[in-house]
Amino acid sequence: MIITQADLREWRIGAVMYRWFLRHFPRGGSYADIHHALIEEGYTDWAESLVEYAWKKWLADENFAHQEVSSMQKLATDPGERPFCSQFARSDDHARIGCCEDNARIATAGYAAQIASMGYSVRIGSVGFNSHIGSSGERARVAVTGNSSRISSAGDSSRIANTGMRVRVCTLGERCHVASNGDLVQIASFGANARIANSGDNVHIIASGENSTVVSTGVVDSIILGPGGSAALAYHDGERVRFAVAIEGENNIRAGVRYRLNEQHQFVEC
């Protein structure tokens, strides 16, 4: 996605950041390049603001998901970072870890950690707030407990678990599994045969890959399914918990359309 001066004006960016943008990207720039430049110059707060704006505008766009993954891959291949880390743990704030090895084990406990991996079957755990985690290898395992974290995965058969609030999860690979019980979470999955389980409230879910399945016991504010997709969302009818079921192609449920449950517990466009 290309970010222009018009986007900055729409987002009501402050004067200092606006001037920085004009100096570095006078003709606009990609989300990944701008994010990387902000991180490199130490403007982590601005980078986080960029993430907030971009996710609000392009959450349902698969091209944005690719750029989100790309923005973290830059860290993994940065020669100034640590490219080999079969087992690595840090507890300091603002840690930056890049890893290209297979079967690596990475753990962080500090605030605003940035972790990027490109290897096969990597295991990543983070308990700090505002962490950014990117993985492009297959069969990655990611567990996050910190609020306001961001997880991006491009590999097939990834497994992601989250317990933090206001977390953003983005997956591109096929057969990915996502489990989340934090409130105010945004989940976007574009690969086929994804499985998403949610127990948090006020969550937005996109499962636009073919034959993906969503089950939620928490309140879902909106959901988008792909071809062959299905969803079961829990609600309370005043006496007991029941499930409203949506199956793409049945009862006017269409792929790529955003739905919510109305007061009658029926799926309606929103």
Curated annotation (Swiss-Prot):
Which NCBIfam families does the UniProt record give?
PRK09946.1 (NF007410)
Protein name (record) = Uncharacterized protein YdhT
Tell me what turns on expression of this protein: Up-regulated by the oxygen-responsive transcription factor FNR under anaerobic conditions. Repressed in the presence of nitrate or nitrite via the two-component systems NarXL and NarPQ, respectively.
The scientific name of the source species is Escherichia coli (strain K12)
